[in-house]
């Protein structure tokens, strides 16, 4: 079995033993095959059997990833499979010519509604139930409904009662106009049954079965038994298809201590067509996370906003609804409703969120193992510390340290440093790297704290050698692995190796390193900007200096130390201000410089 198939097999071991659909992807992220299963783990495992056909083996040689969507029943899986195949038209699926769809039960919107089987949806106010995969079951249940309840079968009015009235299967609404209340009660009972409330009807069938068996009418007993089975199967709520001519999204968030999994189930023209998964590491509380995610997700430029956005808990959404509608120039609703259908859909979203988290963690673990192999490490890089340097034209140089554990950010391990070894205006990333590496690991050694498994430097060979020289000086180069990742080329550099390592963009090990590098870069820049902004805001404390002029002082004159190198005339000339204001700026810089005697480690 090829390596990629081994990796896939490990992924499948995490699949649940529940019903659902699976999508098989190629290396270029194209869907090759879509299938459904009663037991996802068991079904997908079958593709790895030695007894599979030649065509299946060709398929599996091209599959690099398998994504699944769990459902609440096998029926739902079958319907979802149908919808997905129609949407994506995968290479290895049969192209079906018959696209008439599955039948449904229609209750018309007439004064005296009729009930019948249909495959066509008419948006006239009629109510629909289904669709139903097993047509035989549907026919048996419709026959039971028609015999149990006195519903209208005729389309036209008549002066005389119809045949069904004489058979006791019609109230006589075809010739009478005074039966509206009584007829409405019949219809409500039928809807009650079609919504899954079948216990009373099942009890009636049991009684009838005993009666016909007593009379030795075994043929009738067999039919009643089949009807009972059909009623049970058909009562399973078919939530994959919602008979609404609109688009709806259902959002669910599964929170854990380290990660939030966000699932959006997308319905279009009444059909579940897509699942969108997002992972979030923010520290927002649940209500705030719902609000923040909806705002960012639905206001993004290319996002098509649905008619309705269903959420899984009640919160105030008036402001974000208004914001989305104004920005997108649409009219959408963000709603929370505890209907039976909505609860079922949220249950499905919950199941998919939990499964996505398992898959995500599995992929992270696989990436860490991959990274160990590529970097030729002796142990897994479970803890990675990443460093980056930031400055603005050599001023206020800072360093950042970020920590990742098993491929995920560990915020408690974040640090920022002010670099002391460089004077203002001096640009030397290697010297800055040496300082921060020395400060960080001298502290860990002195305090006998645990060392990371891997150090990542944002930069190239020069920055790597600078950091490695410090590790050698501390005599810990054998205890910690170290590498550098260059930005544009995305080349990995290792100590004592002339050639860098170039990985494919989709390589999971590279993605882990990129995440660490990008987070260190973000953290360093944020801290550097904060320091510059603090100086700018401090300048506004000078009487007569507003925010715009403070910004100009920082840009033209620089930091407090830079100002101390200038005399009042030079300040006045550079800033194009009078000597009095120049004196104020010089005096303020002297005061601030004296007050700035503080620890550089934040």
From Swiss-Prot:
Subcellular location: Cytoplasm
DNA repair found in the keyword field: yes
Gene3D superfamilies, per database record: 5' to 3' exonuclease, C-terminal subdomain (1.10.150.20), GIY-YIG endonuclease (3.40.1440.10), UvrC, RNAse H endonuclease domain (3.30.420.340)
Transmembrane domains' residue ranges: none
Keywords from the named record: Cytoplasm, DNA damage, DNA excision, DNA repair, Excision nuclease, SOS response
Cellular component terms per the entry's GO annotation: cytoplasm; excinuclease repair complex
Pfam family, one: UvrC_RNaseH
SUPFAM superfamilies: GIY-YIG endonuclease, RuvA domain 2-like
Gene Ontology BP terms: nucleotide-excision repair; SOS response
Record-linked PROSITE patterns: GIY_YIG, UVRC
Domain of life: Bacteria
UVR domain residues: 199-234
Residue span, GIY-YIG domain: 17-94
InterPro entries per the UniProt record, alphabetical: GIY-YIG_endonuc, GIY-YIG_endonuc_sf, GIY-YIG_UvrC_Cho, RuvA_2-like, UvrABC_protein_C, UvrC, UvrC_RNase_H_dom, UvrC_RNase_H_dom_sf
GO molecular function annotation: DNA binding; excinuclease ABC activity
Family, as annotated: Belongs to the UvrC family.
Subunit and partners: Interacts with UvrB in an incision complex.
Protein purpose: The UvrABC repair system catalyzes the recognition and processing of DNA lesions. UvrC both incises the 5' and 3' sides of the lesion. The N-terminal half is responsible for the 3' incision and the C-terminal half is responsible for the 5' incision.
UniProt name for this protein: UvrABC system protein C
Annotated organism of origin: Borrelia duttonii (strain Ly)
Taxonomic lineage of the native organism: Bacteria, Pseudomonadati, Spirochaetota, Spirochaetia, Spirochaetales
């Amino acid at each position: 079995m090829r390596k990629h198939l081994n990796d896939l097999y490990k992924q499948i071991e995490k699949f649940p033993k529940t019903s659902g659909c699976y999508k098989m992807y190629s290396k270029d992220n194209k869907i090759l095959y879509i299938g459904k299963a009663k037991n996802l783990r068991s079904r997908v495992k079958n593709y790895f059997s030695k007894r599979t056909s030649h065509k299946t083996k060709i398929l599996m040689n091209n599959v690099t990833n398998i994504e699944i969507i769990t459902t609440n029943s096998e029926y739902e899986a079958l319907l979802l499979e149908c919808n997905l195949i129609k949407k994506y038209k995968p290479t290895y699926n049969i192209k079906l010519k018959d696209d008439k769809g599955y039948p449904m039960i229609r209750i018309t919107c007439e004064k005296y509604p009729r009930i019948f089987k249909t495959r066509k949806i008419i948006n006239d106010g009629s109510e629909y139930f289904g669709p139903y995969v097993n047509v035989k079951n549907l026919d048996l249940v419709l026959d039971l409904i028609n015999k149990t309840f006195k519903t209208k079968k005729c389309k036209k009015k008549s002066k005389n009662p119809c045949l069904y009235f004489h058979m006791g299967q019609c109230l006589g609404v075809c010739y009478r106009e005074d039966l509206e209340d009584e007829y409405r009660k019949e219809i409500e009972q039928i809807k009650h049954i079609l919504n899954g409330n079948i216990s009373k009807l099942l009890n009636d069938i049991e009684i009838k079965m005993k009666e016909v068996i007593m009379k030795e009418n075994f043929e009738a007993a067999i039919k009643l038994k089949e009807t009972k089975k059909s009623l049970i199967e058909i009562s399973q709520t078919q939530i994959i298809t919602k008979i609404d001519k609109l688009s709806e999204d259902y959002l669910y968030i599964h929170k854990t201590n380290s990660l939030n999994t966000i699932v959006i189930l997308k319905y279009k023209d009444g059909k579940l067509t897509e699942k969108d998964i997002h992972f979030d590491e923010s520290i927002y509380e649940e209500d705030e996370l719902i609000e923040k995610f909806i705002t960012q997700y639905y206001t993004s430029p290319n996002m098509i906003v649905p008619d309705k956005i269903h959420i899984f808990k009640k919160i105030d959404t008036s402001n974000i609804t208004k914001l989305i509608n104004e920005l997108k120039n649409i009219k959408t609703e963000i709603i929370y409703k505890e209907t039976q259908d909505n609860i079922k859909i949220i249950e499905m979203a919950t199941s998919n969120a939990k499964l996505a988290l398992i898959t995500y963690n599995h992929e992270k673990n696989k990436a860490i193992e991959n990274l160990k192999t590529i970097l030729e490490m002796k142990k897994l890089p479970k803890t990675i510390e990443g460093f980056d340097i930031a400055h603005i034209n050599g001023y206020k140089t800072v360093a950042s340290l970020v920590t990742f554990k098993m491929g995920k950010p560990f915020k408690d391990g974040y640090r920022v440093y002010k670099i002391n070894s460089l004077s203002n205006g001096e640009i030397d990333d290697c010297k800055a790297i040496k300082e921060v590496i020395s400060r960080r690991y001298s502290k860990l050694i002195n305090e006998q704290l645990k060392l990371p498994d891997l150090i990542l430097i944002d930069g190239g060979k020069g920055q790597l050698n600078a950091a490695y020289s410090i590790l050698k000086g501390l005599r810990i180069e054998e205890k910690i692995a170290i590498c550098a990742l260059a930005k544009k080329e995305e080349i990995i550099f290792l100590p004592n190796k002339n050639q860098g390592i170039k990985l494919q963009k989709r390589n999971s090990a590279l993605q882990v390193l990129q995440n660490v590098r990008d987070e260190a870069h973000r953290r360093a820049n944020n801290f550097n900007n904060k320091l510059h902004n603090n100086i700018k805001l401090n300048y506004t404390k000078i009487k007569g200096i507003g925010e715009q002029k403070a910004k100009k002082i920082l840009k033209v004159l620089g930091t407090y130390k830079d100002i101390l190198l200038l005399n009042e005339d030079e300040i006045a000339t550079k800033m194009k201000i009078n000597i009095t204001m120049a004196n104020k700026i010089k005096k303020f810089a002297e005061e601030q410089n004296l007050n700035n005697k503080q620890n550089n480690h934040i």
